[in-house]
């Protein structure tokens, strides 16, 4: 379960968000600059709320009163950026394995091959991001996240840069891949995407759920 209760003063408005989810896919909708991505960044530890509390599976990640603020690398949160953030000079295999090596995970090769098989990208192991289609890049990015065995997945507008035809195909792929027993937050300004993927839906306007 993910429990979020945060407040952060921003230049345009005050971010004041509270919600909790279990093994659901939560869709956060709203216009650009409404506070959706900032909410994800606070959960991930990229940004720090002014006050509040974030609890993941009973583990306190942030508590302003108790002065708890767990570092990004220790939160076990999977964050997928709009651009997928793949390393252009690394192969698919290297993109997935590099973070595991940094975390000193045992049996890196076994873990990498397992997630590549799971996301049907084994044949792409030695290719580079520029040699991949949009759908393949998305699968690699998800495989890299899942290799870390995160406790929650945060997906920040993963379709924003794609054309409509490709987006339709990838929505179906993503829906299949997200049948997992953990909380997922999907951020989008597209109502159709959220309705298709998500069990729960919240709309954010000027930093508040409406």
Where in the sequence are the language-model features?
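A short, proline-enriched helix->beta-strand linker immediately N-terminal to the Walker B motif
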Residues: 147-151
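Conserved ABC ATPase "signature" region
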Residues: 59-64, 106-124, 175-176
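Catalytic Walker B motif of ABC-type/P-loop ATPase nucleotide-binding domains
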Residues: 153-157
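Hydrophobic anchor residue at the start of the ABC signature
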Residues: 142
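ABC ATPase NBD coupling module
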Residues: 61-78, 102, 109
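Conserved H-loop
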Residues: 182-188
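Conserved ABC ATPase signature
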Residues: 128-132, 136
């Amino acid at each position: 379960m993910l429990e979020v209760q945060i407040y952060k003063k921003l230049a345009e408005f005050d971010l004041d968000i509270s919600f909790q989810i279990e093994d659901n896919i939560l869709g956060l909708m709203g216009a650009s600059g409404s506070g959706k991505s900032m909410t994800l960044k606070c959960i991930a530890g990229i940004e720090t709320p002014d006050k509040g509390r974030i609890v993941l599976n009973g583990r306190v990640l942030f508590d302003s009163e108790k002065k708890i603020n767990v570092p990004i690398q220790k939160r076990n949160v999977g964050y997928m950026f709009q651009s997928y953030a793949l390393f252009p000079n690394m192969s698919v295999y290297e993109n997935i394995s590099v973070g595991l090596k940094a975390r000193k995970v045992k049996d890196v090769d076994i873990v990498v091959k397992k997630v590549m098989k799971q996301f049907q990208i084994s044949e792409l192991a030695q290719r580079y991001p520029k040699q991949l289609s949009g759908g393949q890049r998305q699968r690699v990015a998800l495989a890299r996240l899942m290799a870390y065995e995160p406790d929650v997945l945060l997906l920040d507008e993963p379709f924003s840069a794609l054309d409509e035809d490709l987006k339709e195909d990838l929505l179906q792929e993503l829906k299949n891949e997200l049948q997992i027993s953990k909380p997922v937050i999907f951020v989008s300004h597209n109502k159709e995407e959220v309705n298709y993927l998500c069990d729960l839906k919240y709309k954010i306007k000027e930093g508040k759920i409406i």
